């Protein structure tokens, strides 16, 4: 689940597109597209992409909640390149030749935009590629957790992770998405004037950096980021010394007592999730806490009482025929109810908007009453200037599709070539619907399209091939649809910063190629160093089991559910739809108190501790806003990103130490007093 950053939620796209920063951007000299893609920029994007891939992988393999990191990526891109251009003048006497070279090529907002786009395309592969969900669901451990004897979970329906096939799979499906909607970029960005709120917010941030006032603000943000990065990294290093055994260290600190700790109610001192809580809205964090109380505080203790009646008493709790089955399928029910509701809602909004635009176009053939400010016209002119031929997009799409149709069935024998053909034929239609809906609502529905594809391909594949076919089909559709929407989102940022579509496409392609290599390598490092997918450990990777169970449901239907699980799951599905209806139809002053179903669902499998961490982040933001609202609005994203990056980057040396069999020297553990 990806949560929207509050600073993005507050952005008013209408005001942004006519602001003074935008006018200043339009007035300055815009470099040609080849000068916008620079070697120093690609090096910076590679470093940022690697750092954030490590962070994203940690988040995906622990809880699956991914906050929006685009704003902090833009900040890091600015920091890296501003430092690059100014370092020679500071380090060399008189500035040196390198300094004069830097002056010859100034750091522009266009270069900043391309670097941010490239870095985001790189690290997005960490969760968009399915390493915490559909791809991990293929491994043997998830196959065994789902129940070897479970109907539909056919024997041998697993594939262990490997660098070769994972890299090949990502290359086969990711680049096609870049060409999916390329011929429609003008229609979506200029003709329909879609806002793409997150893309607009990123453009505002980048435009703001490249003004005198914005540079002063950026200095404060950089200082806040570096301070919190250092604190977070040192704290993570300090914590490591106390984790020399099972259930040891500050990660298992029984903050509210041992009884609450057994039900996962404790603060685990994870600055990653404190930072994520600072970025996510208060509603997301409180929804997660509400879900934790409902599940671990009420539901699971009550269902545990039925052990021996509803489910066998002689099987481990991690079995799908035991308590874990109820946890898993009720979580799936909440997510599916939420996803289906929003899928129908966004599809309806998209259809209505397209119909209204069509009617307006017919009614105003001769005259157009819309007025454009000069800055808008200049943006449109720059956006259209560097033309990308449509034939190139069509030919590339056809060629890459043929490669995928040949390669994917070789990787997965259960996936027939015609499954891949169907996915690639549907991709442009689904991609346009998703890109248009994202532009209107800022909700990328690629995961929901992927889940629908999962059920269709799982049912189509039948009992023997259905699980693998469903999971792979889900990954194909999700990635095709997501990449095309992400590209339109980036084109919106480029449109507002006067960045060439060609340089944006090149940056996105380079970032995608980086991600296709970095993400599998990073995942395999984590996979070999830690116990990934253990439902009782830290690295729970809950979405892997959720996706596999959805594939089993697609194959077997409701016969796969434990006793009374169907009734309970149906109740949670209906509850999910109901609270979404309440959010849409209640007066605004009440709807902000209605929880979000998907945020509620994550603690069902993961536990309450991460929800408590995120609520601590919310509490910090709330208190800071009360004390100094202007300072908090400026520094919260930077401080939160520092916490996330410091704790997240420690995972890299930590995993290397684990692979080298270097164990922490101390185990700090808590037991009841005598």
Curated annotation (Swiss-Prot):
It holds the Pfam family OPT. The keyword Transmembrane applies. It is a multi-pass membrane protein. One of its GO terms (biological process) is response to iron ion. It is found in: Cell membrane. Keywords: Cell membrane, Ion transport, Iron, Iron transport, Membrane, Transmembrane, Transmembrane helix, Transport. The keyword rRNA-binding does not apply. Residues 1-29 are annotated as: Disordered. Its main location: membrane. The gene is YSL2. Residues 7-22 have a biased composition (Basic and acidic residues). Expressed in phloem cells of vascular bundles in leaves and leaf sheaths. Expressed at low levels in phloem companion cells in the central cylinder of roots, but not in the epidermal or cortical cells. It comes from Oryza sativa subsp. japonica. Involved in the phloem transport of iron and manganese and their translocation into the grain. Transports iron- and manganese-nicotianamine chelates, but not iron-phytosiderophore. The chain crosses the membrane at residues 41-61, 64-84, 118-138, 162-182, 224-244, 283-303, 329-349, 392-412, 420-440, 452-472, 506-526, 559-579, 604-624, 633-653. One of its GO terms (cellular component) is plasma membrane. Belongs to the YSL (TC 2.A.67.2) family. It comes from the Eukaryota. Induction: In leaves by iron deficiency. One of its GO terms (molecular function) is iron-nicotianamine transmembrane transporter activity. This is Metal-nicotianamine transporter YSL2. PANTHER family: METAL-NICOTIANAMINE TRANSPORTER YSL2, OLIGOPEPTIDE TRANSPORTER YGL114W-RELATED.
């Amino acid at each position: 689940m990806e949560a929207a950053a509050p600073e993005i939620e507050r952005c008013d796209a209408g005001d942004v597109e006519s602001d003074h920063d935008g006018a200043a951007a339009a007035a300055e000299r815009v470099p040609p597209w080849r000068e916008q893609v620079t070697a120093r920029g690609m090096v910076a994007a590679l470093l940022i992409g690697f750092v954030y891939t490590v962070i994203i992988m940690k988040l995906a393999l622990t809880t699956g909640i991914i906050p929006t990191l685009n704003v902090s990526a833009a900040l890091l891109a600015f920091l890296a390149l501003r430092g690059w251009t100014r370092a020679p003048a500071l380090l060399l006497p008189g500035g040196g030749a390198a300094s004069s070279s830097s002056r010859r090529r100034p750091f522009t907002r266009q270069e900043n935009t391309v670097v941010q786009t490239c870095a985001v395309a790189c690290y997005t592969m960490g969760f968009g590629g399915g390493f915490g969900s559909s791809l991990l669901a293929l491994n043997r451990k998830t196959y065994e957790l789902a129940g070897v004897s479970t109907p539909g979970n056919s024997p041998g329906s697993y594939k262990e992770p490997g660098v070769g096939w994972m890299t090949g799979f990502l290359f086969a499906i990711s680049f096609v998405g870049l060409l999916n909607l390329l011929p429609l970029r003008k229609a979506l960005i200029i003709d329909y004037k879609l806002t793409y709120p997150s893309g607009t917010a990123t453009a505002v941030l980048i435009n703001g950096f490249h003004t005198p006032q914005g540079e002063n603000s950026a200095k404060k943000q950089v200082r806040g980021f570096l301070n919190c990065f250092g604190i977070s990294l040192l704290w993570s290093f300090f914590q490591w010394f106390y984790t020399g055994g099972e259930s040891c260290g500050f990660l298992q600190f029984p903050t509210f007592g041992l009884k609450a700790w057994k039900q996962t109610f404790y603060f685990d001192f994870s600055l990653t999730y404190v930072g994520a809580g600072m970025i996510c809205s208060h509603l997301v964090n409180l929804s997660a806490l509400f879900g934790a109380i409902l599940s671990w505080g009420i539901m699971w203790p009550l269902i545990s009482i039925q052990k021996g009646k509803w489910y066998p008493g002689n099987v481990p709790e991690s079995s799908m025929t035991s308590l874990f089955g109820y946890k898993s399928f009720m979580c799936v029910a909440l997510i599916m109810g939420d996803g289906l509701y929003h899928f129908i809602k966004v599809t309806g909004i998209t259809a209505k908007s397209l119909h209204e635009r069509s009617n307006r176009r017919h009614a105003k053939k001769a005259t157009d009453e819309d007025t454009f400010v000069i800055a808008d016209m200049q943006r449109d002119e720059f956006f259209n200037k560097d033309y990308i031929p449509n034939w190139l997009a069509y030919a590339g799409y056809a060629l890459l599709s043929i490669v995928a149709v040949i390669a994917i069935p070789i990787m997965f024998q259960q996936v027939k070539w015609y499954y891949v053909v169907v996915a690639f034929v549907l991709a442009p239609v689904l991609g346009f619907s998703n890109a248009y809906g994202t532009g209107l609502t800022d909700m990328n529905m690629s995961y929901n399209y992927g889940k629908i594809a999962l059920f269709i391909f799982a049912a189509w594949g039948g009992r023997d091939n259905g699980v693998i076919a469903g999971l792979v089909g889900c990954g194909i559709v999700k990635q095709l649809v997501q990449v095309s929407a992400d590209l339109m989102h980036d084109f919106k940022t480029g449109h507002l910063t006067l960045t060439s579509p060609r340089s944006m496409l090149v940056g996105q392609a380079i970032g995608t190629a980086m991600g296709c290599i970095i993400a599998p390598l990073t995942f395999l490092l984590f996979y070999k160093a830690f116990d990934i997918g253990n439902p009782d450990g830290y690295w729970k990777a809950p979405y892997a089991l959720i996706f596999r169970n959805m594939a089993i449901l697609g194959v077997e239907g409701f016969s796969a559910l434990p006793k009374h699980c169907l009734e309970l799951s149906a109740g949670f599905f209906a509850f999910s739809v109901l609270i979404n209806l309440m959010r849409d139809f209640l007066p605004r002053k009440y709807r902000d108190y209605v929880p979000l179903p998907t945020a509620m669902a994550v603690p069902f499998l993961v536990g309450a501790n991460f929800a408590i961490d995120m609520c601590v982040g919310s509490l910090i933001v709330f208190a800071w806003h009360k004390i100094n609202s202007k300072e908090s609005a400026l520094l919260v994203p930077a401080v939160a990103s520092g916490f996330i990056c410091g704790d997240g980057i420690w995972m890299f040396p930590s995993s290397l130490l684990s692979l080298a069999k270097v164990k922490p020297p101390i185990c700090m553990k808590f037991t009841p007093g005598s």
